Amino acid sequence: MPTKSFHRTDRVSAQVRRDLGTIVHAAVRDNGLPSVSVSDVEISRDLAHAKVFVTALQQERSAEAVKGLKEIAGQLRTQLARAMKLRHVPELHFHYDDSVDRGERIDNLLRDLDDVGPEATSSDEDAEQR
């Protein structure tokens, strides 16, 4: 039976995502930033850098949220170091995760397609066949 190997970076990434999620939640409240949640963390092989992907509850304020997180990244890293028992805590680089927005857009397009109904699509197909 093949076993799935877990690399240290995967384990550290999962732990950073859990701990940083809690830390960011508190920091957002304390610093008056728009609400965000940590959706994913990618850590470099040498554990020196972490790409932290966040999603904003208010998409129009996402740039403001990411900018605010970048400004307090040093404080967040210090709090993360206290929470984790690592010799070296990765440098945090915040990025907006637009996958939720893209998924919502696709969902809306599919709903619009359902609203059009099968009559419109069959007449389009008839026109293409001529």
From Swiss-Prot:
Record-level GO cellular component terms: cytosol
Gene Ontology biological process: maturation of SSU-rRNA
GO molecular function, one term: ribosomal small subunit binding
Region (Disordered): 111-130
Keywords: Cytoplasm, Ribosome biogenesis
Gene3D superfamilies for the chain: 3.30.300.20
SUPFAM superfamilies for the chain: Ribosome-binding factor A, RbfA
Main location: cytoplasm
Pfam families: RBFA (PF02033)
InterPro entries membership: KH_dom-like_a/b (IPR015946), RbfA (IPR000238), RbfA_dom_sf (IPR023799), Ribosome-bd_factorA_CS (IPR020053)
Localization: Cytoplasm
Annotated signal peptide: none
Its biological purpose: One of several proteins that assist in the late maturation steps of the functional core of the 30S ribosomal subunit. Associates with free 30S ribosomal subunits (but not with 30S subunits that are part of 70S ribosomes or polysomes). Required for efficient processing of 16S rRNA. May interact with the 5'-terminal helix region of 16S rRNA.
Family: Belongs to the RbfA family.
PANTHER family: RIBOSOME-BINDING FACTOR A, CHLOROPLASTIC-RELATED
Assembly and interaction partners: Monomer. Binds 30S ribosomal subunits, but not 50S ribosomal subunits or 70S ribosomes.
Name under which the protein is recorded: Ribosome-binding factor A
Biological source species: Xanthomonas axonopodis pv. citri (strain 306)
